């Protein structure tokens, strides 16, 4: 179970960010036309508390959020959360923190691009295949997609991380969207530079040229039916280190609970994914590549020592 010190750390970071975010929002509010008085009564629980509870859920052994909220947050951790909503009210309020949660991840806890990045996608199954035609929550939203283990129904999470194992960016799409999709790659590689290592599913001359123009050099392996070509030694070494992004996906699924089939609304499904990625950013151990690098000021060329 997560310690009190860790919960306090997450809450303090989230609370400081939410206060700054509210100040920025207050500067951008449009003036009222009717000059009518508005109520500004605060909720019993702040956005920071909701974000903290959602993130801490992925640190515990509870496999059901309702049990976690009722028997952990409102009982065991009552000293940390003295004023809490009922479970039904908490579920209603949760989607209202979507903007704050997304901004918190993007601006406060996600990592930065260092010039060495890894990209991959993982499947997010939301329902068993045999229940596809009786699906209600994700009707007309979830689609069929194919993975190495066969067909599944749900979505696809595209992730970008650096060599430290820190998530840089993400994109959630339907299951039948190609990894090389132009919109997906443009969103993922925004503010990314340097080398981008990917698997053979990202082989595309069009994608290579488009990223090259943005200052990103995508490096992939070669298929068996492709003509062999020379590749720098450090690129070959870094392609073998792609297990970093695979380990990130594994921790999101097995340590956190980014995949399960108990969703009752689309909003809470998205909040669960955001909370899982937020929890991963606070994990004490992350997969990483053991090497040292520097960029000499003389020529600006990236130098790697394995």
What is each of the regions a protein language model found here?
Residues 1-306:
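Short alpha-helical elements
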């Amino acid at each position: 179970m997560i310690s009190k010190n860790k919960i306090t750390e997450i809450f303090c970071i989230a609370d400081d960010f939410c206060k700054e975010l509210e100040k920025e929002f207050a500067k951008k509010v449009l003036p009222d036309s009717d000059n009518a008085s508005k109520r500004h009564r605060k909720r019993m629980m702040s956005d920071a508390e909701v974000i903290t509870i959602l993130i801490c859920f992925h640190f515990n052994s509870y496999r059901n959020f309702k049990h976690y909220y009722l028997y952990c947050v409102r009982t065991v951790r009552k000293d940390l959360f003295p004023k809490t909503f009922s479970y039904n009210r908490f579920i209603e309020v949760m989607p209202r923190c979507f903007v704050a949660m997304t901004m918190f991840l993007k601006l406060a806890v996600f990592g930065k691009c260092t010039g060495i990045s890894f990209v991959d996608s993982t499947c997010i199954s939301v329902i068993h295949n045999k229940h596809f035609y009786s699906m209600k929550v994700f009707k007309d939203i979830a689609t069929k997609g194919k993975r190495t283990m066969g067909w599944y129904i749900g979505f696809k999470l595209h992730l970008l991380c650096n060599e430290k194992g820190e998530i840089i960016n993400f994109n959630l799409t339907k299951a039948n969207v190609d990894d090389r999709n132009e919109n997906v790659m443009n969103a993922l590689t925004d503010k990314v530079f340097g080398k981008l290592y990917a698997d053979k599913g990202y082989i595309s001359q069009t994608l290579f040229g488009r990223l090259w123009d943005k200052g990103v050099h995508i490096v992939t392996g070669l298929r068996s039916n492709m003509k062999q070509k020379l590749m720098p030694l450090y690129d070959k070494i870094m392609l073998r280190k792609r297990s970093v992004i695979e380990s990130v996906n594994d921790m999101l699924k097995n340590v956190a609970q980014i995949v399960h089939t108990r969703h009752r609304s689309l909003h809470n499904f998205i909040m669960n994914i955001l909370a899982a990625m937020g929890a991963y950013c606070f994990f004490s151990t992350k997969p990483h590549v053991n090497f040292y690098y520097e960029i000499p000021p003389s020529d600006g060329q990236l130098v790697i020592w394995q």
